[in-house]
Amino acid sequence: MPDTYGYEVDEKRARETLNTIFDGPVNFLDTSNNYGFGRSEERIGDALRERGGLPEGFVISTKLDRDMESGSFDASRARQSLEESLKRLGVEKVQVLHLHDPEHASDLKEITRSGGALDELFKIKEEGLADAVGLAMGKLDLMESILWDWPFDALMNHNRWNVINRSADSLFKKAHERGIAILNAAPYASGVLAKGSDVMPRIAYQHATTDALEPVKALEMICAKHNVPIGALALQFSTRDPRITSTAAGVTKPERVQQTLDWATAELPDELWEEIENINFSSEDPEANREYKPG
């Protein structure tokens, strides 16, 4: 997904990374019908078939996606999306299934009307093809307008609850009070809070301006002072939040799996958490000016 992350991952490295995940203590993997135009699910499915199936107790989460050419996202497309995903993954059902990115559909009414894609999502759950269903997207205002009108088990939001952007705070509070499981994605702001501002000067899948990188550089200085990897700070900012059920962080190398586990369990001093509260964070939409390119 070079347009999203700025680089590609070859087949061999992807397989090695997946096997490291399946062999370790991690028990949750998130993907989507349209990630890499289906290549993500295909790679996961190939790895699972080679292993003889999904490890016991492992949770696969995927997402229903619109037709990527027409933008159509009616009930028929939702069902087709599921069928494509099950075939690629080589499974009969998934543990978690989200409706994905309605903000990019050609007609929102196809999704929300009676008999639309959302009704199809809950029908899929009733049929036992998904254990839990959710809404996965970015735009908070649209997410909130949909979220309370259906009995979602979960939500997934990205890039809007991390050390440098806290715009999802209000929505997460309301969702938690209603008992909706919160899956917080992109704790590294799409990479800069893991690899650093010099290596990965991108925020929310876009090249970041000098001004946008200022809080990142300030955090890097604080982390260096305390001898703490900025990735550990970014990851634990999410994992220590009692409202958040699970944090979805991307890994593209086998060694990143163990690094993520190390970051998640690293002991961070109280002084660090106190100091970062003095850093300016954004409450604005991090994708307001993004030129979206699917895949």
Give each language-model segment a name.
Residues 1-12, 64-77, 109:
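Active-site mouth loops of central-metabolism enzymes
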Residues 23, 45-56, 86-91, 146-150, ...:
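Acidic (Asp/Glu)-rich catalytic clusters
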Residues 86-107:
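Active-site groove signature of glycoside hydrolases
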